[in-house]
């Protein structure tokens, strides 16, 4: 996360360690020493799976044999790994499925990296790892004050999971604070060294953290504030902007950043996230098996022989093509496929609407007016309109003419001015956005006359 720090809730500050500067200085000195490091063992439930139980379900925390053996359970044969290519293969119902492991997963299996959970317990090894994390966070999150990062990383109420390249090089990590009473944890910092960001460490680290937290605590949710650059990463890791956790549970406990986007992740109880790629393939295999029982789409039929002699091609009845009738095809479907999917004005409407949505004055008009917040609005405004409704209508091909599109846009501005007073900010926002809209339309010669 990289965002300017504006405010931090009092409830989350706690008592600051008085010796934080001393601890940081001592840890910096320890990094220069050549000290053998003892691994911090994770719970036994988090051991790497060598084989997965068959069927449509995958058991949590299952642990396979160290040496793969020939066996078949529920139609799933033992996986075979091509170590050179990093490709994992397994058989399900006689069909081979395979997926490519991330470089970070391969490196962990080869013993080149490890994932270690550390906190400020004043031990030499943990302080060295925490200092390595602090340095990465300070470099990768330049908008955060360095003293603030150091204070939280060394805070004894926080835990960190670090990615360590052996023997002892910290390449990234996540610092988080658990709130077990509320069954959630706050991800405070998350960063990978800039030289290591193409090897899948970020995703693999998050999967390790989810499995570790779920196996050792009663925590079910992650909350974090993400800046614009981090939103994409968190979305890929299962986070969403829709916060379902009750506000009374977390409000006042987590650090609040102005300009950040609050995101939430609910951890599924029956999923082992380190095996997510295999689980998804198993689900696909089970679905394909079910499809084959009710459909004939998997049958490969021979090609048409009429095209072998190109000099004597004759028209054929489509219904005589093997499998076409069984697939449910009709001549009407062919006619429907020939119709254009979008109207002639679609691209222009989409571009104009996108620019409207991104305009600085558009925020009051992005969504419909909340009936609970403004109860009398719909009594006064009989034909409400907003930019999200326009987007839905556009995607559903409900704007046959550009005049209809312009009508709805003007409806937004007129409704706002009709309901709000002339001296209100909403009235001024409507004028600004309307002026921008008119300017964009006048830039398109074939539509500029429609504004008159």
Curated annotation (Swiss-Prot):
Instruction: Please give a single GO biological process term from the UniProt record.
Output: chromatin remodeling
Q: Give the molecular function GO annotations.
A: histone crotonyltransferase activity; histone H3 acetyltransferase activity; histone H3K14 acetyltransferase activity; histone H3K18 acetyltransferase activity; histone H3K9 acetyltransferase activity; histone reader activity; lysine-acetylated histone binding; transcription coregulator activity
UniProt-annotated location(s) = Nucleus
Residue segments, region Disordered: 1-78
Which residues does the entry assign to the active site, renumbered to this chain? 186 (proton donor/acceptor)
Give the EC number(s) listed in the UniProt record.
2.3.1.48, 2.3.1.-
User: Could you confirm whether the keyword Acyltransferase appears in this record?
Assistant: yes
Composition skew (Basic residues), residue ranges: 1-10
Q: Name one GO cellular component term.
A: SLIK (SAGA-like) complex
Q: A Pfam family name for this chain?
A: Acetyltransf_1
Detail which positions bind acetyl-CoA: 190-192, 197-203, 229-232
- CDD domains documented for this protein: Bromo_gcn5_like (cd05509), NAT_SF (cd04301)
User: Top EC class per UniProt?
Assistant: transferase
The residues covered by the N-acetyltransferase domain are 113-268
- Site location (Important for catalytic activity): 186
Q: What catalytic activity is recorded? A: L-lysyl-[protein] + acetyl-CoA = N(6)-acetyl-L-lysyl-[protein] + CoA + H(+); (2E)-butenoyl-CoA + L-lysyl-[protein] = N(6)-(2E)-butenoyl-L-lysyl-[protein] + CoA + H(+)
Basic and acidic residues: compositionally biased ranges:
16-44
Keywords tagged on the record: Activator, Acyltransferase, Bromodomain, Chromatin regulator, Nucleus, Transcription, Transcription regulation, Transferase
| Described purpose of this protein according to its UniProt entry | Histone acetyltransferase that acetylates histone H2B to form H2BK11ac and H2BK16ac, histone H3 to form H3K14ac, with a lower preference histone H4 to form H4K8ac and H4K16ac, and contributes to H2A.Z acetylation. Acetylation of histones gives a specific tag for epigenetic transcription activation. In addition to histone acetyltransferase, can use different acyl-CoA substrates, such as (2E)-butenoyl-CoA (crotonyl-CoA) and is able to mediate histone crotonylation.
- Describe the family membership recorded for this protein in Swiss-Prot or TrEMBL: Belongs to the acetyltransferase family. GCN5 subfamily.
What is the designated name of this protein? Histone acetyltransferase GCN5
């Amino acid at each position: 996360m990289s965002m300017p720090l504006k405010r931090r809730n009092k409830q989350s500050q706690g008592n600051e360690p008085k010796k934080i500067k001393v601890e940081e200085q001592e840890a910096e000195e320890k990094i220069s020493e050549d000290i053998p490091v003892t691994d911090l063992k994770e719970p036994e439930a988090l051991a790497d799976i060598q084989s997965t139980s068959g069927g449509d379900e995958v058991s949590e925390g299952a642990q396979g044999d160290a040496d793969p053996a020939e066996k078949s359970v529920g139609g799933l044969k033992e996986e075979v790994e091509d170590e050179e290519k990093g490709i994992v293969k397994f058989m399900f119902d006689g069909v081979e499925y395979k997926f490519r492991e991330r470089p970070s997963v391969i490196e962990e299996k080869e013993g080149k990296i490890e994932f270690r959970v550390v906190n400020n317990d004043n031990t030499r090894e943990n302080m060295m790892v925490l200092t390595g994390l602090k340095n990465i966070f300070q470099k990768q999150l330049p908008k955060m004050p360095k003293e603030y990062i150091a204070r939280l990383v060394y805070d004894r109420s926080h835990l960190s999971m670090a990615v360590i390249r052996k023997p002892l090089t910290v390449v990234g990590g996540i610092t988080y604070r658990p709130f077990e009473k509320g069954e959630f944890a706050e991800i405070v910092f998350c960063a990978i060294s800039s030289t290591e960001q193409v090897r899948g460490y970020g995703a693999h680290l998050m999967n390790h953290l989810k499995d570790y937290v779920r196996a050792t605590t009663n925590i079910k949710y992650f909350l974090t504030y993400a800046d614009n650059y981090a939103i994409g990463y968190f979305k890929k890791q299962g986070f969403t902007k829709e916060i379902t956790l009750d506000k009374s549970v977390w409000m006042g406990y987590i650090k609040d950043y102005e300009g950040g986007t609050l995101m939430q992740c609910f951890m599924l109880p029956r999923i082992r996230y380190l095996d997510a790629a295999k689980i998804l393939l198993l689900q696909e295999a089970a679905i394909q098996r079910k499809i084959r029982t009710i459909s004939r789409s998997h049958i490969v039929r021979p090609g048409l022989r009429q095209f072998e002699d190109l000099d004597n091609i004759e028209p054929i009845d489509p219904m005589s093509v093997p499998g076409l009738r069984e697939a449910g095809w009709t001549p009407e479907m062919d006619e429907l496929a020939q119709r254009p999917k979008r109207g002639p004005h679609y691209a222009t409407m989409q571009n104009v609407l996108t620019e409207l949505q991104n305009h600085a004055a558009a925020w009051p008009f992005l969504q419909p007016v909340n009936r609970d917040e403004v109860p009398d609005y719909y009594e006064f405004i009989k034909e409400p309109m907003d930019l999200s409704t326009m987007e839905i209508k556009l995607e559903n091909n409900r704007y046959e003419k550009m005049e209809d599109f312009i009508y709805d846009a003007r409806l937004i501005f007129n409704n706002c001015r009709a309901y709000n007073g002339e001296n209100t900010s909403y009235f001024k926002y409507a004028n600004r956005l309307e002026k921008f809209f008119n300017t964009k339309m006048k830039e398109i010669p074939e539509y500029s006359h429609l504004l008159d």
